[in-house]
Structures are given as structure tokens and as C-alpha cells.
Amino acid sequence: MAGQQKSVTLRFLAAPMDANVRGYVGGGKILEWIDKAGYAAAAAWSGHYSVTGYVGNIHLHRVVNVGDMVEVEARVVYTGRTSLQVVCTVTSHNPRDQVRVTNTQCLLVFVAMDSDGKPTPVPPFEPEDDWEREENERAQVLTAVRREVDDAMALQVYSEATETCRETLRFLAAPTDVNWGGKVHGGYVMHWIMTAGKLVAERYFHGHARATYAGGFRFYRPMYIGDIVEVDARLIYTEGPEMHVSVYVRSGDPRGTELQTTTHCTIVYTARDEEDGEVPVRPWVPRLPEDRALERHAVDLIEIRSRLGRNEPHEPHAD
């Protein structure tokens, strides 16, 4: 029954096929898990199919190792008229020692849809304990911050007038990428974004880079099976060991000529040495006007997000 179940927990072992080329489970796969758990919680509370609108403020604290027992807990913390905000917490442990670590925590926004694909009202959520009250209040603060970030993003130009390190992936959305609504799964889109961003970071650094923060995946429109997909990633800012990479996803009918923007995110990667310690990267010094504007934009986003005031997870039932 809608409005009754407010949390869902997925439990499973991280499999060898989940690992990246470095042998551990990277941020892209973790985001796939998060999107699935978040969808389950949103659908259970709303009683409707729900689409991902936003996934953000993602601090990737620790990697998941192959063979770890993984728990992805998704909890509804706030509702609007047709939207739901869900906090997802990912923890993992080696089954042989039971020492649990928190890998990441983030906020997702879903919109409930009726049978005609239109937004539909959801049952109101009322927090019942200290953790829920704090997350409910924080969700409202994050909504205001997202609007400020959206306004800043709308002013930026991404064209061919650039000298930065840039990579573009192109492929067709396959039937295996489908979600429960017949469109491309948002978790897979996030995985593609993380892959393209990592490619740019490692090409620029000429070494290993790990995703440590994602500033917000914004989903503007759905993507369909059979669409041609273009994932365009470019470096926009460096500081110390950090490389800030902006990624746009566009898609469209391969028989047509125009691709439409479906998703955008900015990801922070850190350069790592052979012992997995952080090392500085050579500074990116932009010369062209567009590149300089995007560098200023990255600095502005850092300032806006600094007001969020929390980098560590706030685990459920920790109070």
C-alpha cells in the first residue's frame, strides 16, 4: 500500500564482473546499485513507477572490494507534490570479519508517474525520528542549493572552442540497458558518465585516477533503446590532486541528425600513485575564453557546495 513502506535495503555480494580494470568496484557500478535501491523505495512509497530526476552530493569515501557483502539502504526523507527525495547509504564488509565500512551516501530525487507517463501526486511523508527530521530539513536546504547550481550551469557554454583534455564516447543504447519503464536505466547512464570522466582524468594525469565526488547527475529527458548516445567529457579545473570533469550526455534517433541533452554531471577525480596515495597533477591553465569561463564556473560551484556543511555520511539510526 502506498505511503506505508519508506525504506528498502538491497543485500548482495560484489561479484568479479562488478570490478573495474583496477580490480575493485568503482563509482559507476556503485551508482547503478544506488539507482536501483532508490527506485525501489520511491516506487514502494508512491505506489507508482518513478523516474530519476537527480542524484547528487555523492562523496565516494571508500571502494567496494570483490567478494564484499554490500548493503544499499534507501529511505524516503521528503516528498513534494509529485516528487520524492530518497537518501541512499552504501555499506560493505568482508563476510569473514564483519567489519563494516560506509562507502558512500547520497540524495536522489524521483518523480512519480501515472499510467499515461504524467507526474502524479504522492502520499506526504512526515518524519518520525531524529534522523528522519534532520534529513527532511537537509533535503529542503539541498533543493535551494540545486536551484542555485542550476542557474549557474544555465549560463555556461560548451562548444568546440576549447583546448582542454576532452573525450567523446559514442554507441547505441542496447536492449540490455532497459529499465522497468522500457527506457534506458538511469544507473547505466551514470556508469557511462563515470567511465568517460575517468578516461579524461587518467589521460590528463597519465596515471590512475579515482572518483571521489560527483556534484549532481541531472536527468533532463529520457533515453530510448536504440538511440545513438554521445557522452562528452572535458576537464574544466584542477587543484592539487583534484581534476574536475564536466560530462554531458546527448542522445537521439540514429536516423535523425539532432541529439538532445539528456544528462549532465561534474565529477571530481583524484590522482593516485602506485600505493594509492594522492599526488598532485600539473595545473590546467586555460587560455581560450570558454575554457576560462568554465574554470571560473568550477570555482563558483565549489563555493556554492561548501555551504552544504557535510562531507561524511549521516547513517540511519546513528542517533
Go through each PLM region and give its residues:
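Hydrophobic, helix-prone linear segments
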Residues: 1-73, 99, 177, 283-287, ...
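Catalytic strand-loop segment that frames the active site of acyl-thioester-processing enzymes
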Residues: 1-26, 125, 139-192, 199-200, ...
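Hydrophobic beta-strand-centered segment that forms part of the acyl-chain substrate-binding groove
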Residues: 2-5, 25, 38-85, 91, ...
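HotDog/MaoC-like acyl-thioester-processing domains
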Residues: 3-10, 64-66, 77-147, 225, ...
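Generic structural detector for well-ordered beta-strands
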Residues: 11-14, 59, 109, 170-172, ...
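Hydrophobic face of alpha-helices
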Residues: 31-35, 190, 194, 244
